[in-house]
């Protein structure tokens, strides 16, 4: 048997960061994080990678709103 203790996988860490961005940084309901809107999926992925820059939560909220607005006006 192996002596290594099972640790969190990369996918679990990524999911944990994703939930942190949705719930703490953007203050969105959990249901929204499961949405399949392409802009939301793209921006959440971007924000998850930028986890060290969460000093100004309002900037992330405004950026997300701006990106959603831009995506709707281009149609």
From Swiss-Prot:
GO CC, alphabetical: host cell nucleus; viral capsid
Compartment(s) of residence: Virion; Host nucleus
What is the superkingdom listed in this entry's lineage?
Viruses
Q: Which GO terms describe its biological process?
A: viral process
Q: Which UniProt keywords apply?
A: Capsid protein, Host nucleus, Virion
List the Pfam families hit by this protein, alphabetically.
Answer: HV_small_capsid
Q: Indicate the family of this protein.
A: Belongs to the herpesviridae small capsomere-interacting protein family.
Q: What does this protein do?
A: Participates in the assembly of the infectious particles by decorating the outer surface of the capsid shell and thus forming a layer between the capsid and the tegument. Complexes composed of the capsid protein VP5 and UL48A assemble together in the host cytoplasm and are translocated to the nucleus, where they accumulate and participate in capsid assembly. Participates in the assembly of the infectious particles by decorating the outer surface of the capsid shell and thus forming a layer between the capsid and the tegument. Complexes composed of the major capsid protein and small capsomere-interacting protein/SCP assemble together in the host cytoplasm and are translocated to the nucleus, where they accumulate and participate in capsid assembly.
- Describe its partners and assembly state: Interacts with the major capsid protein/MCP.
**Name of the featured protein:** Small capsomere-interacting protein
Gene for this chain? SCP
């Amino acid at each position: 048997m192996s002596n290594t203790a099972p640790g969190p996988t990369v996918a679990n860490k990524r999911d944990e960061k994703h939930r942190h961005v949705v719930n703490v940084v953007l203050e969105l309901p959990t249901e929204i994080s499961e949405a399949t809107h392409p802009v939301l999926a793209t921006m959440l992925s971007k924000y998850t990678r930028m986890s060290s820059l969460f000093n100004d939560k309002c900037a992330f909220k405004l950026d997300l709103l701006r990106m959603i607005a831009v995506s709707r006006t281009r149609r």
